[in-house]
Amino acid sequence: MAIERTFSMIKPDATKRNLTGAITKMLEDAGLRVVASKRVWMSRREAEGFYAVHKDRPFFGELVEGMTSGPTIVQVLEGEGAILKNREIMGATNPANADEGTIRKVHALSIGENSVHGSDAPETAAQEIKYWFSDTEIVG
Ligand code: UDP
């Protein structure tokens, strides 16, 4: 499998509970390498822009509220098949449906406060990385 890069976020529900290290360790233990990382407090405009694909969904307002309620760690992860590997270690969107040992099973509070984000395909990974990072901020 090819070496890929994907975009990941440790969401405010998790940073507020001081889980940045614990979640990053789970990503690293799964074979992913953090090649860029920064801590941001998203503006409403940034959150709405990032999640624009969901703007007509009923949970959009709540999603933007949650994402602007505290700091987020935005990261670029690199590794073999990184996009799928990250989705696997994250677990299902709703933690009630997440497999044992996944980040969302272990740490998420609810479908809205589900601790992590990960790109779902190569195209979205490229877009999402570009949304938060310049090329020089990524050090492989
Ligand atoms: N979300 C929510 N309620 C829902 C579906 C999604 O609050 O019914 C939030 C949740 O935080 C999720 C995000 O919207 O992580 C993006 O949804 P998506 O379906 O893309 O899930 P993901 O890719 O994050 O698993």
From Swiss-Prot:
This is Nucleoside diphosphate kinase. The active site is at H117. It catalyses: a 2'-deoxyribonucleoside 5'-diphosphate + ATP = a 2'-deoxyribonucleoside 5'-triphosphate + ADP; a ribonucleoside 5'-diphosphate + ATP = a ribonucleoside 5'-triphosphate + ADP. Its EC number is 2.7.4.6. Belongs to the NDK family. One of its GO terms (biological process) is CTP biosynthetic process. It comes from Rhizobium johnstonii (strain DSM 114642 / LMG 32736 / 3841). The keyword Transmembrane does not apply.
